[in-house]
Amino acid sequence: MTRQEVFNWCRQQYGTEPEYPWNDWNAVLRHTDNQKWYGLIMEVSRDKLGLSGDGEVDILNVKSDPMLIGSYRTQEGFFAAYHMNKENWISILLDKPELDDAIKKLLALSFELTTSKKKR
């Protein structure tokens, strides 16, 4: 999924729009009721993720179950959360079609984990 595809999917599933709190390319996905983040799309240098080559890539940070994070991090395209709590968040490389299903599942889980306690 590209960042735009993530935004479109979240709009269809949750009725949320990306927000740009830092007036740059990085976008936050948040609940409309409690304002909690369930996703963060950032552009980061490849070297910050241990990837070869020059330039930057888009990643998606989502909240997840710590048990799942350990399992996902053994797979290509998943990383310790960049600029987030590494125990509860994971970074996923975007623009890798083979990760699309996992991205949707993890976005859904992140949305659920950050939902207001009243709604659970």
What are these regions (language model features)?
Residues M1-R120:
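Charge-dense, helix-prone N-terminal extensions
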